[in-house]
């Protein structure tokens, strides 16, 4: 298994800390709003990593957190007259619904920052005892980055550009020093009583503490195998996580770092400041979650994905082909084509090379359709095809529906009943040799994007996109 390590800037063999086990921490959302397509892409990217590792024989523990203590949450909670717990719970539920719709496997653990305050306080106390952290006059506590000789080694940033983002805070020793603890500032703030004084943790210390408490291995130079997240988190978040873990525990937080690329909307980086954020829940109003997943996984996880509906509809044709083949072979699972399994898995074992994997999939679909044309009643062949498609489902998380359900997506139950009535009406018209009426009914349904197919078993229908 090869993965691209952001720190080394190259593909490297994945050699876990424990044989055939993989511990992965994925930075989850700050839950002050609904999930956008960037969140969805990150979740799907590392869901693919997990699936690939599991099918390669690894025992995977994947932890994805919820940041439920943050300035944005506090500000919005006060604005909406809610507690931060109420607000964050709303968006945790929303995020979970969205990812379920996208067929993202549930993480092994989903810690909330608010559940690990003691661990955060303890870690900050360690940094204070080591004289690596310092308190300023308003009670805030910062980490002195000059004490970490490796600071900047992960992101390899340009300090004159990147540190300018952070801004100069009075009494900070260095501009790049970052906050570990924010003291309670009064009525429009949130604070927790602690040995550090009343206050709340900074963003970066939250993730480091959760990694330590949920995944960290003892007596190794690294706490976990893989730390993952969006490339926008590389600096300052992941850089600061790595720094404070080195300083507190004397080890690296992760052996490997993996980052997924941005999502652009019509060639512009998606951001709330530009007003072009695309919420997953809004996309799901127009497209089934499987169709959206199929599109988002179709571009290599490290590349920028330029979201547009034209490309989404083109990518849907791949799903259509899967379900067309599945439609032809409903029955019992047989023996998988071992060459196909090996070939597609090896593609994904090469840093999730999805373009090659999808090419292998397309070849299999074409080949199996040709074989079926020649041997339409061959049960062993049908069983093999179903086994191949089942492996695709397990590896890529697509193709898991019943074909009829898939081809009728987006049609309400009441509408289905009306369509069936029209089909019966058309059947009677044909029996009475009233072919003009029969054709009229077909055209009427087609105008509503419902296509009829006459088969030896009767008339079936599909929803057109």
UniProtKB/Swiss-Prot annotation:
Keywords: Aminoacyl-tRNA synthetase, ATP-binding, Cytoplasm, Ligase, Metal-binding, Nucleotide-binding, Protein biosynthesis, Zinc. Its cofactor is Zn(2+). Zn(2+) binds at residues 27, 207, 237, 241. The keyword Zinc applies. It comes from the Bacteria. GO terms for cellular component: cytosol. A motif ('HIGH' region) lies at residues 29-39. InterPro entries: Cys-tRNA-ligase, Cys-tRNA-synt_Ia_DALR, Cys-tRNA/MSH_ligase, Rossmann-like_a/b/a_fold, tRNA-synt_1_cat_dom, tRNAsynth_Ia_anticodon-bd. Monomer. This is Cysteine--tRNA ligase.
